[in-house]
From Swiss-Prot:
Belongs to the PqqD family. This is PqqA binding protein. Monomer. Interacts with PqqE. It comes from Xanthomonas axonopodis pv. citri (strain 306). GO terms for molecular function: quinone binding. Functions as a PqqA binding protein and presents PqqA to PqqE, in the pyrroloquinoline quinone (PQQ) biosynthetic pathway.
Length: 92
């Protein structure tokens, strides 16, 4: 992993936007010269990347919202965040 922990507070990098692609009927992250399609789970996580909430807080919110195991949600949130960070879509 690239230094991402449960205390990381990610936000979208400058030039990256979360947008609904109406032609595809799908939410995407738009970055210069690329588009990353998001599934429903990645979308609810990406919507919370505001630079103020930690990954632990995001995981707790999602666990409560979906009545799911908090530890598993946190592991999944960290994994997704690491993937998007490696693609240079997030800042920490």
């Amino acid at each position: 992993m690239s230094g991402i922990t449960r205390d990381s507070r990610p936000a979208l990098r400058a030039g990256v936007r979360l947008q609904q692609d109406r032609a595809r009927d799908q939410w995407v992250l738009l970055a210069p010269e690329r588009v990353v399609e998001l599934d429903d789970i990645a979308l609810v996580v990406a919507q919370r990347y505001d630079g103020t909430r930690s990954l632990a807080q995001i995981a707790q919110e999602l666990a409560a919202e979906f009545d799911a195991d908090a530890a598993q949600i946190e592991a999944d949130v960290i994994e997704l965040t690491d993937t998007l960070h490696q693609k240079r879509l997030l800042r920490l």
